[in-house]
């Protein structure tokens, strides 16, 4: 049924030789390429994670700076509004003082003119009274 001749050892030797050749020519270079590719992927992933961490740190820093800048701008705006309010209040107070001073000056001038008018009229009252009496009674009776 089975013949044991040199065919079986030759076939075994061919199989071993083929395995050694395939290992040297195909499997080792292929596993080397796969290992290099896996290492490249690990390095790239590690670099990407580092870049992501740096980017997130920069984003946090910029957000902090932006928040600080917003706070400063709000403080500057509040300060400017307070200054404007103070300046407006000072101007209103100055205008009120000026209006009061003008009012008092006009009132004093009116009072002075009133006094002058009364003095002028007092002088004329005597003269007019005399003229009225002369017209009513006649010039001979009034003296």
UniProtKB/Swiss-Prot annotation:
The chain crosses the membrane at residues 6-26. It comes from the Bacteria. GO terms for molecular function: proton-transporting ATP synthase activity, rotational mechanism; proton-transporting ATPase activity, rotational mechanism. Its main location: membrane. Pfam families: ATP-synt_B. The keyword Transmembrane helix applies. It is found in: Cellular thylakoid membrane. Keywords: ATP synthesis, CF(0), Hydrogen ion transport, Ion transport, Membrane, Thylakoid, Transmembrane, Transmembrane helix, Transport. One of its GO terms (cellular component) is plasma membrane-derived thylakoid membrane. It is a single-pass membrane protein. F-type ATPases have 2 components, F(1) - the catalytic core - and F(0) - the membrane proton channel. F(1) has five subunits: alpha(3), beta(3), gamma(1), delta(1), epsilon(1). F(0) has four main subunits: a(1), b(1), b'(1) and c(10-14). The alpha and beta chains form an alternating ring which encloses part of the gamma chain. F(1) is attached to F(0) by a central stalk formed by the gamma and epsilon chains, while a peripheral stalk is formed by the delta, b and b' chains. Belongs to the ATPase B chain family. This is ATP synthase subunit b'. It comes from Microcystis aeruginosa (strain NIES-843 / IAM M-2473). The lineage of its organism: Bacteria, Bacillati, Cyanobacteriota, Cyanophyceae, Oscillatoriophycideae. The gene is atpF2.
């Amino acid at each position: 049924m089975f013949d044991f001749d040199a065919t079986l050892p030759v076939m075994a030797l061919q199989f071993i030789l083929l395995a050694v050749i395939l290992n040297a020519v195909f499997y080792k270079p292929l596993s080397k390429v796969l290992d290099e590719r896996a290492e490249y992927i690990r390095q790239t992933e590690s670099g990407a994670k580092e870049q992501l961490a740096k980017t997130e740190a920069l984003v946090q820093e910029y957000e902090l700076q932006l928040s600080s800048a917003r706070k400063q701008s709000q403080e500057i705006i509040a300060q400017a509004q307070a200054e404007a309010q103070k300046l407006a209040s000072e101007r209103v107070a100055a205008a009120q003082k000026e209006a009061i001073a003008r009012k008092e000056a006009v009132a004093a001038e009116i009072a002075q003119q009133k006094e002058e008018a009364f003095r002028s009229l007092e002088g004329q009252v005597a003269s007019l009274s005399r003229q009225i009496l002369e017209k009513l009674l006649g010039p001979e009776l009034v003296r």
